[in-house]
Amino acid sequence: MIARLRGTLLEKRPPTLVVEANGLGYEVEAPLSTIEALPETGREVILHTHLSVREDGQTLFGFRTRAERDLFRRLIRVSGVGPKLGLALLSGVDGEELVRCVRDDDPKRLTQVPGIGRKTAERLIVELRDRLDGVGGGSTAAPAAGADHPTGENDPVSEAIEGLVALGYKPPEAARMARNAAEPELGCEAIIRRALQRAVPRGG
């Protein structure tokens, strides 16, 4: 089991990262909260990881804190929630808010995440309610300097569209969301975060 990865950040293409360690390039999938907190490419990063092994391949998931990884592991134990959906949940709702939704019995907030219907949201709340002791999501870490700015020459809007599609949105919807959220000087991660925040109105 790979529990921790330390190396040079080569690529940031939400939700995918490439980290080079000891001459090997590791492809890592990470929630938006983790990607936003990382430095620019070329810098050293440390990720707490979870390796998912299935018949069709292996996927390495990375998180900026142990608490966020632990929350992910609790999520994927819920019936009907696999690693991909768990990643989408932690990208659409940050860890602390997810914990709040469970403790406040608020399934409506969770149903705004692609792939989460009413029944799945209610099941999440029921099954997670007694599993969250000591878990807060670890979302208090501040984003790294420069995280809200483009990290390469690629169009941040196009990369944001790709990221939203990877999180479960249909391409036309992802394009609309990204373009509506885009502003000059915003990088890919910031556009995705803004698009997700607009898609999930608070207090609704």
Curated annotation (Swiss-Prot):
Residues 153-204 are annotated as: Domain III. Residues 1-64 are annotated as: Domain I. One of its GO terms (molecular function) is four-way junction helicase activity. Keywords: Cytoplasm, DNA damage, DNA recombination, DNA repair, DNA-binding. The keyword Oxidoreductase does not apply. Residues 65-143 are annotated as: Domain II. Residues 144-153 are annotated as: Flexible linker. GO terms for biological process: DNA recombination; DNA repair. The keyword Iron-sulfur does not apply. Pfam families: HHH_5, RuvA_C, RuvA_N. One of its GO terms (cellular component) is Holliday junction resolvase complex. It is found in: Cytoplasm. CDD domains: UBA_RuvA_C (cd14332). InterPro entries: DNA_helicase_Holl-junc_RuvA_I, Hlx-hairpin-Hlx_DNA-bd_motif, NA-bd_OB-fold, RuvA, RuvA_2-like, RuvA_C, RuvA_C_sf. NCBIfam families: ruvA (TIGR00084). The RuvA-RuvB-RuvC complex processes Holliday junction (HJ) DNA during genetic recombination and DNA repair, while the RuvA-RuvB complex plays an important role in the rescue of blocked DNA replication forks via replication fork reversal (RFR). RuvA specifically binds to HJ cruciform DNA, conferring on it an open structure. The RuvB hexamer acts as an ATP-dependent pump, pulling dsDNA into and through the RuvAB complex. HJ branch migration allows RuvC to scan DNA until it finds its consensus sequence, where it cleaves and resolves the cruciform DNA. Belongs to the RuvA family. This is Holliday junction branch migration complex subunit RuvA.
